[in-house]
Amino acid sequence: MESERDRGLWITWYNLPEQGKDDYLSWLHETYLPGLLKRPGFLWAAHYASLDEEKIPRRTSGAKFTTDDPAVPRGDRYILVCGAEDTNVFGNPLPRELHAGLPAEGRKMLAMRIGERLNVMAEAARVAGPEAKNYQEGMMLAPCIQLGSFQCPWQDEEDALAWYARWRMPAMSKLPGCIRARKLASVAGWAKQAILYEFTSPDARNHFLHSHEDGDSNREWTDKVVRSLMHSPGSANVARRLWPYPFTPA
């Protein structure tokens, strides 16, 4: 199926200064991203702005841990995701090699990024949500996403695998407003795993808390798995799509 061709993802998290931000966004959306999509193997690209925490209902039970390693860049306000058939597309050339070959103006724009962090990931599993049948944008990542990226001690990885396979992903396949859920495994970058949920809108995402989290009959297991994860800075991000348009209003 065409919708299952995009198994490789290049994900970049970063922040921007206020000064020059509008010029950067215009360049990214009008020049940089259209240019990427002309490259062999690139299937789609989507750019997101993370929502402020006060706009995001979160689960209130259990603990969540975020790395405080100073070597891990802490950008998370913008998320850029590119999809390809597999991760080799992002290995030849590497992102840094691709960027080194840009014109001077492009390199100047990229230098505005603060706390830039990237992962190249392969899709390990996918489920379709109830809204998949109505989604009109094919492989394109949804108007709203929740993206968690993390490490897990190897001793706990089998339990986390079972929890996602037996509980979380089957539950997402039934959650109103959900288009897809994808489990990702890293081939490059600090985070070794990620979970990517796709929603029709931020309001639809909030059902994740009320319809799913609050009704979790596996709460003890859920809390055990959550405690075993060490998240990237800002994870799990909830974000609205800025490009391609139309984007989801904040």
Where are these regions (language model features)?
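Macromolecular interaction modules
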Residues: 1-250
